[in-house]
Amino acid sequence: MAELNHPLNFGRRTRKYDDRWRLTQMRKRVALVRQQLHRLAQDSGVTTDGSQPVNHPVVHEGNGTLRRVRVRLDYGTDGLDVDLPDERVTVIEPVLRPAVPDAAATLTTALRAPIGCSPLRQRIRKGQRVAISVCDITRAQPRREQLAALFEEMPDVPRSDITIFIATGTHRSNTDAELERMLGRDILGSCRVLNHDSRDTASLAFVGRTSTGVPVHLNREFLHADVRITTGFVEPHFFAGFSGGPKMVAPGLAGLETVMTLHDAGRIGHPNATWGVTDGNPVHDDVREIATMVGVHFAVDVTLNRDQQITAAFAGDILQQHRAACGYAKETAMRAVEEPFDVVLTTNSGYPLDQNLYQAVKGMSAAAKIVKRGGAIVCASECRDGLPSHGSYGAILASQPTPEALLAMINSPGYSTPDQWQVQVQSQIQLKAQVLVKTSGLSASEISAAHFTPIDDVAQTVDSALKRAGAGATLCVLPQGPQTIPYLRESLRS
């Protein structure tokens, strides 16, 4: 991973903004006024909408006083306000990217000036069957906008010849109500929509093996379409490097055997299987190769901001456009720090990613990049969908008494169970730091059974963790969870 040109100074009383994304002088003045008003409101005991801290694009640090600062955490759909010791806290967020002024126009421009291939209009004709993959309910993809733009570029293709594939991977099928929220009645009423099922062997076709031996079983109907298109959104991924692009083929539309091999203990445990790394990442290398084997004809990816608004669109050859999108997302999300922190407070980016504890491991993984060994990670994730109840995650956790025992089991020869990859990453994190979890959707006993420490009050928990760490203890907050990927500058890869 090449070093990013984001010079940061993490001194206690200094602040430097990213040169590339420096705010205009007027916006700086507005931000300063808002911050001063916020402090005045705190001093007077007043809480108003304006009392929330200014969301700086890079870092907000304490000013050396004993006052507390209010930080808004992404939690469920409503968020969670937490008051933290101002002199201790460093808040790190992605570079502030405004929404594009016209999402439809931005998508159309990308589709008509694609990267690495000819425009979609020139690649499709009447009578062809079209397959389009989209993310499942756990992802905040703007599906309707992307599909609408694609439909405009396929004027001669009737909706009855288009099938939308929900790229669930090994996740559960999405319900009718969820599909309506995701796609809308118009698309549901005019296009065929299919939930992919990785366990339904009759719906799969064997394509071959990758150069590393991964058996490639993919959705048969997707493969048999005349035109295969993927849509997604790109953000850092905790072991695949980045989401979107080729991941919308595998694991998105892959069979269970393929997913299990892509996510085996050796690949997940590889040092390059991490946030923001693609080249040399064994997971991403295989995923790219699978997409090439399939022959995807066109791909559309977007990047999003905190409000789940489109900030950029990319289209064209699945690998070339994805590489461009990854570069853009990396500049937004990857933030360098000089030293690890005693305590890191994180989230799982709010709804829909924080629907369950399984997904919350991603937020913990982001925090683990910069927490001191023996430190504490505090994770606030709503988990309205529980563990969840489907899948093997809960059963694996219940099968062993400690994270150490879980890792030993997963790394033992011949062990292979769906969802083991999430438990593997979770256990690796827990060997480095204590993990304390705030959730509204799980009981304290359920959190404890998952080998975490349950908490009710985030601020009190942070205070206690800082006290245990001793004088001069440091605190970092990732309000947007894995939308921000901090890393130690010394750990940069080329």
In which residue ranges do the predicted regions lie?
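N-terminal amphipathic/basic leader segments beginning at the initiator methionine
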Residues: P57-T109
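C-terminal catalytic subdomain
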Residues: D354-L436
